[in-house]
């Protein structure tokens, strides 16, 4: 997940800072991140959980970085509303941090995914790495009157689907 956001950021820097740099690479990377954001939003279960896979899982809510960045930049695809993304991300954050099992006695994040699980971290992971979880909080940089905060709350895709409500059909992505 962090590679998607890093690629878009790199392409944006190249586009903005290099004379005659083609905009097409940035646009392609941005569209791919938007598509990934749509998939990521669908991964969030009605209970606010998400699939546990990948070597970066100790970053916990850092997995929400692409959605957070899309919202912060105002790049959410038309298929995702601000209210929908806000409510889905909040559900994950509440589930992850609501019971304090992820913090040690001094209030610092522990190595693990949901609790102290140091065996799942890689040799290069340390307690500082865990603060990539804060990437989910990028929207906190948005003003209070931004649509991310003011749009009406909406159920996210999996919540609608499992609740028997109408929800958008997924589709193939073509460039």
Each model region followed by its residue ranges:
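Terminal, non-catalytic domain-edge segments
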Residues: 66-175
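Long, well-ordered mid-to-C-terminal structural blocks that present hydrophobic/aromatic surfaces
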Residues: 11, 15-81
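Solvent-exposed loop and edge beta-strand segments that line ligand/cofactor-binding
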Residues: 5, 48-64, 117-129
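Single conserved hydrophobic/aromatic residue that forms the stacking wall/gate
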Residues: 1-9, 14
